[in-house]
From Swiss-Prot:
UniProt pathway: Cofactor biosynthesis; 7,8-dihydroneopterin triphosphate biosynthesis; 7,8-dihydroneopterin triphosphate from GTP: step 1/1
The EC number(s) this enzyme carries: 3.5.4.16
Protein name (record): GTP cyclohydrolase 1
Gene Ontology terms: biological process: one-carbon metabolic process; tetrahydrobiopterin biosynthetic process; tetrahydrofolate biosynthetic process
InterPro entries, alphabetized: GTP-CH-I_C/QueF, GTP-CH-I_N, GTP_CycHdrlase_I, GTP_CycHdrlase_I_CS, GTP_CycHdrlase_I_dom
Reactions that this protein is recorded to catalyse: GTP + H2O = 7,8-dihydroneopterin 3'-triphosphate + formate + H(+)
Length: 192
């Protein structure tokens, strides 16, 4: 299904409509340039749609130095937007993988988190997307991903719970098959 992308001017008019919907005057001094600022910020906030995960992970190193344990990158900070309410959720991602024939520069793991976070998301889907993209592109023995996040849709509206942390995990390969690897990963990340 192809979606016709509106022009910037149509998007700005949509922001003006929302401002009128909440009872504001989009032409008053403080709001006059708000549509421009919102569209510019949305281009950055949602820039993940333009990112190619395969390109991010294409530079691999085959010399693993006979490393046979797991590699982890913990505490990758992110902010994304919930696709249900278009409100932000923020937290940390922990990624581990057990290399088979190659490794990747650790900054690449942070880049794929950013690529998926800078889209409308749900945390569950983002957890799977990160794990599966590492699995598909690096072909490791297994991948583990844990995301812990605070959701504005819980703190700013509805149940008004501002300290509730949602945790999601996804495992592939040896992490999915062998509890000892999951246990080690969870012990490592539970202190973070």
């Amino acid at each position: 299904m192809t979606i016709k992308k509106p022009t910037k001017e149509e998007a700005k008019e949509a922001v003006r409509t929302l401002l009128r919907f909440i009872g504001e005057d989009p032409n008053r001094e403080g709001l006059f340039k708000t549509p421009d600022r919102v569209i510019k910020s949305y281009e950055e906030i949602f820039s993940g749609y333009g990112k190619n995960i395969e390109e991010i992970l294409e530079t691999k190193f085959s010399d693993t130095g006979n490393f046979q344990d797991f590699i982890s990158l913990e505490g990758i900070k992110f902010t994304s937007f919930c696709e249900h309410h278009m409100l932000p959720f923020s937290g940390t991602v922990h990624i581990a993988y057990i290399p088979d024939n190659c490794i990747v520069g650790i900054s690449k793991l942070a880049r794929i988190v950013n690529a998926f976070a800078k889209r409308l998301q749900i945390q569950e889907k983002m957890t799977v997307q990160i794990a599966e993209s590492v699995q598909e592109n690096l072909k490791p023995l297994g991948v583990a991903v844990k995301i812990s996040a605070l959701h504005s849709c819980m703190s700013m509206r509805g149940v008004m719970q501002d300290n509730s942390i949602m945790n999601t995990m996804h495992y592939t390969g040896i992490f999915a098959e062998q509890q000892k690897y999951r246990h080690e990963f969870l012990n490592l990340t539970s202190k973070k």
